[in-house]
């Protein structure tokens, strides 16, 4: 299985309840498409290097995941691009 790390930045003015629902929904996107989540954790609210959609800071969330194919990652990528609560995301393949 290939190992990946997903980092995404959530808009800072989101309510705690909505943030938890967003994280649960995107974790479910991965698991429903065949990926195994090793770890899913919040980092912290951090200042951004430059403004993104008029925000100067964002809530960082990191997911470590294992998957056989890229279907789950492609679906995560597609949905995170159209979600207004996610400012940016990045998927990186980890060394085995």
UniProtKB/Swiss-Prot annotation:
MF-aspect GO terms: small ribosomal subunit rRNA binding; structural constituent of ribosome
Similarity comment: family membership: Belongs to the bacterial ribosomal protein bS6 family.
Keyword Iron-sulfur: no
Protein name from the UniProt record: Small ribosomal subunit protein bS6
Gene name tied to this protein: rpsF
Keywords: Ribonucleoprotein, Ribosomal protein, RNA-binding, rRNA-binding
GO terms under cellular component: cytoplasm; ribonucleoprotein complex; ribosome
Functional summary from the UniProt entry: Binds together with bS18 to 16S ribosomal RNA.
Native source species: Streptococcus mutans serotype c (strain ATCC 700610 / UA159)
Entry annotated with the keyword Ribosomal protein: yes
Domain of life of the native organism: Bacteria
PANTHER family: MITOCHONDRIAL 28S RIBOSOMAL PROTEIN S6, SMALL RIBOSOMAL SUBUNIT PROTEIN BS6M
Single GO biological process annotation from the record: translation
